[in-house]
Amino acid sequence: MSENEPVRRRRRADADRSRTAILAAAITLLDERIDAGMERIAEAARVTRQTVYAHFPSRDALLAAVVDELTRETMEAIDALELETGPALDKVLALIDLSWRQFEQHPLLLQLPQSAGQDERHGPVVERFERLIRRGQRTGEITRELPVAWLVSALIALGHTAGEAAATNRMTPRKASAALRTTATRLLQEPASRP
């Protein structure tokens, strides 16, 4: 090992800590105010603006990293739901509830402009919904009248619609969440089991 190796490791650890602090500060500030600037984020992270730009060359790059971090956290929470056990429809609703809680906890997610990477970020969530819906169709809990891809797209669109309704104060978050659950249930249930 060279004499410089411990110094390099220390610098890397410092850089990792700075990046983590910047992301945490950005998430907190952007949840409060979507137009929070890089200077304010640097202050909250207790780093210089130059350090922020060293990690994230633009505000768009920082926003993308924030969304990536929140997506990672969400996927960890989704995987903890143990989607392979229990009634499929119940698990779909649990997944919707978890996603809704993420939107409530991080309002910035509802305020960000649509990005080119959004479909890519939705990919893991889409895959979980697809597995659940296929399982539910096999067991007869979920309608077979509509294709899996259509049902997943409809669920995601409903989630975005509910989020937008809450974000623009057309509905309270509680009513939007209830409407989302009711609509999702009606969409997915076999016709014979609908109320």
Please provide the spans of the model-predicted regions.
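Short hydrophobic/aromatic patch on the recognition helix
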Residues: R46-F56
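C-terminal peripheral helix-coil segments that are non-catalytic and often amphipathic
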Residues: M1-P6, A94, E127-T139, E164-P195
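Basic, helix-initiating cap at the start of DNA-binding domains
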Residues: M1-E32, M38-A44, A61
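Conserved hydrophobic residue
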Residues: D35, I142-T143, M171
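Alpha-helical DNA-contacting segments of helix-turn-helix folds
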Residues: F56, A61-L70
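Amphipathic alpha-helical packing segments from all-alpha helical-bundle domains
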Residues: A94, Q114-E141, L146-A157, E164
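Amphipathic alpha-helical interaction segments
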Residues: A21, R40, A61, D90-L98, ...
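Hydrophobic alpha-helical connector segments
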Residues: A65, E76-E104, A116-Q118, H122, ...
